Amino acid sequence: MALNLQDKQAIVAEVNEAAKGALSAVIADSRGVTVDKMTELRKAAREAGVSMRVVRNTLLRRAVEGTDFECLTDTFVGPTLIAFSNEHPGAAARLFKDFAKANDKFEIKGAAFEGKIQNVEFLATLPTYEEAIARLMGTMKEAAAGKLARTLAAYRDKLQEAA
């Protein structure tokens, strides 16, 4: 189906707005994946706060101009599925990585975060806000307990020397 100029401009504007508000983007090739599987992926994406869209490469190049995802333009070859993470930088990468494990024909082409091309594995392993806070609290708790143990041991040694 041929798109007229207004349709193309609307697509570019929509994708550009999505790109400006996104934390990260992941590019994939979904050739050969069944419609049922893609529907499942789209549903999972909505639940994870990820917006997905299949866009023509020429329109996508125009849409990402001036955004943090301009570095991905070299990966816009063949059918391109782009996903923007809106709530957590690793959400789209984690979603695509898990989907690619279950679907051999699904190929992840690249990912971008903070204006640089990133490894999908790196983005997928980024902790969520809650996970990062939990790790920090665990580290602080361990440090406090360790300091208490060292203080008690030093006090015990001091008492033994005095005796």
From Swiss-Prot:
Any single GO BP term: translation
Family as reported in the entry's similarity comment: Belongs to the universal ribosomal protein uL10 family.
A GO term, aspect molecular function: large ribosomal subunit rRNA binding
Protein name: Large ribosomal subunit protein uL10
Keywords (A to Z) from UniProt: Ribonucleoprotein, Ribosomal protein, RNA-binding, rRNA-binding
GO cellular component, one term: large ribosomal subunit
CDD domains, per database record: Ribosomal_L10
A family per Pfam: Ribosomal_L10
